[in-house]
């Protein structure tokens, strides 16, 4: 049995000039995940369910657990001293950590502390998403927004934690995707899936079909394609949609499938956030042999213009994403 800590240190040895700072940063995320895991498991017994009566910068009602997870992760990252600042779904602006250690830190972190938190009340899987970059401003001074507005192809590491029937941490540093299952009796994440890859073909599509009437024509046509009977392509495909990006992505990663959150009439730019949802998942997808785009362009090549920028998102098994892109190109949006 190999723990997450042992695995990270082992991989660090492949890089002679590694300083251990990224290892310490990942350790902070690991600690935050353990704390969130502990408290999610007793969410119905303590007063952390439901909303807190305020909205975030995107106008979405903030769940109590959203804010709780945000504070725990922020505290864990700040305490390690390897992070200069964070960007979070739950923060209106970037959070600049103060002090000499923070100003001399090399990294910034973007995160969705609790993806799918509206599912908590009904005991459905939720997750944490994180993305790590080297800062681009000079060491020795506070970070700026420019440090966070980098394209996804500059990510140093990315990953997610899925809190389900078991808690798993899945991450990449650009050398494959590896998954670790939490053993609560030992208090450690243990390697359970090394070098994870999407299956070459898939037969699941994950999309909220309740919004069908609002979808672009290309997405409507792709859904109909998925529903048609054709033995040569193993259709019709199966619909599986949980409503938590982490949970849907995780299932499709292991089983083969595509996740789509397109633009809609009410969200013409899409709804998922580029920096702390699409980019980290796209990095993981490509490292696992999959693909991620906005229906046309590679997600990791898109230059962000604002912290909470939204983006249509197509991610999963490479062949399925390419098929969906073909429908988007063939059937432009209805006028």
From Swiss-Prot:
Record's keyword terms, sorted: Carbohydrate metabolism, Cytoplasm, Hydrolase, Magnesium, Metal-binding
Pfam family, one: FBPase
Entry's Gene Ontology BP terms: fructose 1,6-bisphosphate metabolic process; fructose 6-phosphate metabolic process; fructose metabolic process; gluconeogenesis; sucrose biosynthetic process
Cross-referenced InterPro entries: FBPase_C_dom, FBPase_class-1, FBPase_N, FBPtase, Fructose_bisphosphatase_AS
Domain of life of the organism encoding this protein: Bacteria
Assembly with partners or alone: Homotetramer.
Entry similarity comment: Belongs to the FBPase class 1 family.
Protein name: Fructose-1,6-bisphosphatase class 1
Species of provenance: Proteus mirabilis (strain HI4320)
Gene name of the encoded protein: fbp
């Amino acid at each position: 049995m190999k723990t997450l800590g042992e695995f990270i240190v082992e991989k660090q040895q492949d890089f002679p000039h590694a300083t251990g700072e990224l290892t310490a940063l990942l350790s902070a995320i690991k600690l935050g995940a353990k704390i969130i895991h502990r408290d999610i498991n007793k969410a119905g017994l303590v007063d952390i369910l439901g909303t807190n009566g305020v909205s975030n910068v995107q106008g979405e009602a903030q769940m109590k657990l959203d804010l709780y997870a945000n504070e725990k992760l922020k505290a864990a990252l700040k305490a390690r001293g390897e992070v200069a600042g964070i960007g979070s779904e739950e923060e209106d602006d970037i959070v600049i950590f103060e002090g000499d250690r923070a100003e001399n830190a090399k990294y910034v972190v973007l995160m969705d502390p609790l993806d799918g938190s509206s599912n908590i009340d009904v005991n459905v899987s939720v997750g944490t998403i994180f993305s790590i970059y080297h800062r681009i401003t000079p060491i020795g001074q506070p970070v700026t927004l420019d440090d966070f507005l980098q394209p996804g192809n500059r990510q140093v590491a990315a990953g997610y934690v899925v809190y389900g029937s078991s808690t798993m941490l899945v991450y990449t540093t650009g050398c494959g995707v590896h998954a670790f299952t939490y053993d609560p009796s030992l208090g450690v994440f243990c390697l359970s899936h090394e070098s994870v890859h999407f299956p070459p073909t898939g037969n699941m599509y994950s999309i909220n079909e309740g919004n069908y009437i609002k979808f672009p024509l290309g997405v409507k046509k792709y859904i109909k394609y998925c529903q048609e009977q054709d033995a040569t392509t193993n259709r019709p495909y199966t619909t599986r949609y949980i409503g938590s990006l982490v949970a849907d992505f995780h299932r499709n990663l292991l089983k083969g499938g595509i996740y789509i959150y397109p633009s809609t009439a009410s969200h013409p730019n899409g709804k998922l956030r580029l920096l702390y949802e699409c980019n980290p998942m796209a990095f993981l997808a490509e490292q696992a042999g999959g693909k991620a785009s906005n229906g046309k362009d590679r997600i990791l090549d898109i230059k962000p213009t604002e912290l909470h920028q939204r983006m249509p998102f197509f991610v999963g098994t490479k062949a399925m994403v390419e098929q969906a892109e073909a429908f988007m190109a063939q059937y432009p949006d209805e006028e």
